[in-house]
Amino acid sequence: MNVVFAVKQYISKMIEDSGPGMKVLLMDKETTGIVSMVYTQSEILQKEVYLFERIDSQNREIMKHLKAICFLRPTKENVDYIIQELRRPKYTIYFIYFSNVISKSDVKSLAEADEQEVVAEVQEFYGDYIAVNPHLFSLNILGCCQGRNWDPAQLSRTTQGLTALLLSLKKCPMIRYQLSSEAAKRLAECVKQVITKEYELFEFRRTEVPPLLLILDRCDDAITPLLNQWTYQAMVHELLGINNNRIDLSRVPGISKDLREVVLSAENDEFYANNMYLNFAEIGSNIKNLMEDFQKKKPKEQQKLESIADMKAFVENYPQFKKMSGTVSKHVTVVGELSRLVSERNLLEVSEVEQELACQNDHSSALQNIKRLLQNPKVTEFDAARLVMLYALHYERHSSNSLPGLMMDLRNKGVSEKYRKLVSAVVEYGGKRVRGSDLFSPKDAVAITKQFLKGLKGVENVYTQHQPFLHETLDHLIKGRLKENLYPYLGPSTLRDRPQDIIVFVIGGATYEEALTVYNLNRTTPGVRIVLGGTTVHNTKSFLEEVLASGLHSRSKESSQVTSRSASRR
């Protein structure tokens, strides 16, 4: 169950099926992002694709010597663009691939427009999602709900993305959903409808234990997306923002032109692949090792290129050297900027108090620490508001709740009204009234003992004590202990055996901390394979945008074969 591999396979197959010869790849805005996540431009160039164009671009030239591979979402807009294209074709022959199920009437419209008979084939290839990591996918949707209910357009897009994911992994799952969320139940029903309607597509070889799709709601854990992060990928997203593997460094003081935007992709960057889940402290020493390794391999200026053999060796090593030099400067810049922000915003202290708020139950200590940090001029309004949000969620119903006093402290610190209003919005979004589970107190004797022992021996790393609520949910699911009264099955049947292939989807967005949890569970649980997806992948900033978009605040204070379907063929 590798989503990067699944999407990569589809794109390889499209290019292979078009045969030898020069090609153009025609995409829309969304499929451009889908392709760029799994292939670099230079990799695709090696497959004789010499031109990349957008279907909505008005000024494309006529190039009759090129074959066109079209990879598009099956939207009305895209179908109209293709119809216009076929009436006045710019290329010699067209291979059309839709990223999801396309209606028969749309296929008929394409056939009628193809008077010059330039279409070689029309197929469905289900790469209709963003493959972020091998076990993490996103739909890049920010603001999926209005209040507690779906925005209809986003429900439709999410259903398409999730069913495409299932088809690309060849899974016809049983479905469980979070009972406390109306949105989770609605999505479960929509996915089930598609599976029933398109039953021929979902006829995969039966496995002994059927796969399981578990649909959750971000409202059940509003703590995780509010925390500062200390593992490389999660930290980069939290402090700099990752958008389709791209990081904008244009605001970094003294940044050179070629580093204003960098790409971090585990597919093409060995250092990133090896370090993305490591703690920030380890990254620092690994960067040092990378630098030292680079220094050893660096061609010495004095190195005499006397013989042809010397020159040949230099030229052969140079591309590798150049690539390594790019990797070194990129990671040194990124890590340098993370360090600068940690120091400038006093994030070590801030994060320690965040972890205390997320993991411990000492109210007076937490309150004292927040008040102390709110007095610190280095603590930004963003971080100050975030601390008060965590307090408001954790101690919402505590007998000594001091939220009004903290709100006054925020005002006195000069925190803008926007952030002050967000405190109540976050509680409205993910407070006790909404949650289907208890986020803070351990539920059974074993958990209470564990927490007590953890308190006694101290924690190895105070900055990474927190485990997302998803960890407990998946742990219970894997052990067959996830309560059916909280996470019912859709329909009459239930799973007797422990699940092996699990797809978890979070409405309202997943996080990189949760992706790390899934990565670790995959590594340490033999026989279990988990893929995590979300409407988006959040950092704190985007999560607060999600909360605002919901409008709630206004009311408060590996198989090698590819699943595809031929729509019509000539």
Curated annotation (Swiss-Prot):
Signal peptide: none annotated. It is found in: Golgi apparatus membrane; Endosome membrane. Pfam families: Sec1. Transmembrane segments: none annotated. One of its GO terms (biological process) is vesicle-mediated transport. GO terms for cellular component: endosome membrane; Golgi apparatus; Golgi membrane; membrane; synaptic vesicle. Its main location: Golgi. The modification Phosphoserine is found at S307, S441. Keywords: Disease variant, Endosome, Golgi apparatus, Membrane, Phosphoprotein, Protein transport, Transport. It is a peripheral membrane protein. It comes from the Eukaryota. Belongs to the STXBP/unc-18/SEC1 family. May play a role in vesicle-mediated protein trafficking from the Golgi stack through the trans-Golgi network. Interacts with STX6. Interacts with ZFYVE20. It is linked to Neutropenia, severe congenital 5, autosomal recessive: An autosomal recessive primary immunodeficiency disorder characterized primarily by neutropenia and neutrophil dysfunction, a lack of response to G-CSF, life-threatening infections, bone marrow fibrosis, and renal extramedullary hematopoiesis. This is Vacuolar protein sorting-associated protein 45. It comes from Homo sapiens (Human).
